[in-house]
A protein has these predicted regions:
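Beta-strand-rich modules
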Residues: 417-438
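Pro/Thr/Ser/Gly-rich low-complexity, intrinsically disordered linker/stalk tracts
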Residues: 329-368, 422, 437-450
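Cap/lid segment of the alpha/beta-hydrolase catalytic domain
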Residues: 96, 102-127
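Alpha/beta-hydrolase-fold serine-hydrolase catalytic core, especially in secreted/extracellular enzymes
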Residues: 237-239, 247-344
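Recognizes extended acidic, P/S/T-rich segments that occur
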Residues: 371-423
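Alpha/beta-hydrolase active-site loop
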Residues: 117-144
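The feature captures the conserved acid-bearing segment of alpha/beta-hydrolase catalytic domains
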Residues: 174-257
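A domain-start/cap signature at the N-terminus of enzymes
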Residues: 21-67, 98, 150-165, 169, ...
């Protein structure tokens, strides 16, 4: 089922814009899609750019416990790439685990537009963001969406936006992942008004994630220095903030999702109120249960055993995350020794062009989804897709953009065996392959011609 607001539909028909995320919505995990679009406002202190918000709600979620916000960076390419953000299978897996919605904004910035018209939320984007949540709450029949807490992921200008939102709405934020972007140095230089930073803002869990190759880069050095400066300043105040430099990348997001998703998983576990409770107030972070590391090191210890200076240490939410963090800062990715879940609901149907196979699949929570092996009568028939793509990281079933969103058009969970002879008897099975090459057990079989 998919719900799209009337305003959004009319606006995009008028503008003649293509919506690849809607055209391919069937491939994503079971759930509902909603969309709202707001035109530019001419009112003082309101957003002067248009924006589209796209939301995914997992099937079976009775109460929405939070909203995972995947915020793109500056520029036309970033905002176009964000059109598929709500369809990302791996981020959907995180949302589904915690009964959260997945939200992907796309600000209608053109090349001539100053990014700060939206990435400084004080220029109106914070009001439109709240308006979007309120409208989604009405559309979806989930009134709790309007007040649900947020996980904020931001790349570049999206991190800039998130750092200011943190000063405005700290009580709403479960945690923040800053991928190569923050407004900290910008306000410290006086280029934008410096926000008031409350005690509550220093209680929000954060992870700074710049690319090591940004350090000294002519264009993106500020992403490195800004991330490091914000880390040092906030950690000195006792904030639960970590530093996870990506050794393989410059400003692109690379394979950062394999650490960002575990980070939010740990923060949601630490901070969400009990499911089914009456409150949406977040739990405080108990830093005694954390793991700590020296800055720019690749080893970590429990807080109880750490002997260094805590005010300069890297904060890590728990032991499991610390293991992944150590792997990531060494290699730019994380390990996974477990197989993905087997596909389900395999169906085989005779069509004019061959045997059509459809199935469902859960995304491997640790390492995502790369491909499916199609088996016929116990032997490998094909791999789908034949050559998974991703020039920024591990090849995936959903090819990735520079900004960690799926490349359109998106693939469905279906395959046609065009080599089967008409009327022949065959049994098919499907195997899931994750991004480290681990294979699931085969699915239940689906017979044809019997």
């Amino acid at each position: 089922m998919r719900i799209v607001s009337t305003l959004a539909s009319l606006l995009f028909v008028f503008l003649g814009l293509h919506l690849p995320w809607l055209a391919n919505a069937a491939n994503a995990a079971s759930g509902r899609y909603l969309e709202v679009t707001y035109p530019p406002s001419q009112n003082t202190n309101e957003l002067v750019l248009g924006v589209t918000y796209r939301l995914w709600i997992p099937e079976g979620a009775k109460t929405i416990r939070g909203v995972i916000v995947h915020q793109h960076g500056c520029g036309v390419g970033s905002r176009k790439g964000a059109e598929t953000g709500a369809q990302d299978l791996h981020w959907q897996a995180l949302a589904k685990k915690w009964d959260c919605a997945l939200l992907a904004p796309s600000y209608h910035q053109e090349e001539k537009d100053n990014c700060r018209l939206w990435c400084d939320p004080r220029n109106g984007s914070h009001k439109t963001f709240l308006r979007g949540l309120a409208d989604f709450a009405k559309q979806s029949g989930h009134p709790e969406l309007e007040r649900a807490p947020w996980c904020l992921w931001g790349h570049s200008g999206g991190g800039f936006w998130a750092s200011i939102m943190q000063t405005m709405y700290p009580e709403r934020i479960v945690g923040i992942w800053f991928r190569s972007g923050t407004a900290f140095e910008t306000w410290e230089r006086g280029d934008i008004p410096k926000p008031e930073i409350s005690t509550a803002a220093y209680s929000v869990p954060m992870m700074m994630n710049p690319g090591v190759k940004e350090n000294g880069d002519k264009r993106f050095n500020g992403a490195w220095t800004g991330s490091l400066a914000m880390f040092k300043a906030y950690r000195a105040k006792g904030a639960p903030v970590g530093f996870a430099p990506d050794p393989r990348t410059n400003h692109e997001t690379g394979d950062s999702r394999y650490l960002a998703i575990p980070f939010f998983d740990a923060c949601l576990k630490l901070r969400l109120p009990e499911a089914g409770g009456k409150t949406q107030v977040l739990k405080p972070v108990d830093q005694k249960t954390a793991w700590l590391a020296e800055l720019l090191s690749d080893s970590a210890q429990s807080a109880a055993s750490f002997k260094g200076d805590r005010k300069t240490s890297v904060w890590l939410p728990d032991a499991n995350f610390a293991i992944a963090w150590k792997q990531y800062v060494k290699t730019g990715a994380t390990e996974d020794n477990t197989p993905p879940p087997a596909p389900t609901d395999l169906k085989a149907t005779t069509k004019a062009d061959g045997i059509n196979l459809t199935w469902q699949a859960e995304t491997d929570f640790e390492s995502g989804l790369t491909a499916f092996i199609i088996q016929r009568d116990g032997e490998m028939l094909a791999q789908f897709p034949e050559k998974p793509q991703n020039k920024f990281g591990r090849p995936l079933f959903q090819n990735m953009t520079y900004g960690d969103t799926p490349v359109a058009p998106l693939l469905d969970f279906q395959f046609t065996d065009k080599t089967a002879k008409l009327g022949a008897k065959h049994e098919y099975r499907i195997v899931t392959v994750n991004s480290v090459g681990k294979q699931s057990p085969p699915s239940q079989g689906a017979a044809i011609g019997r």
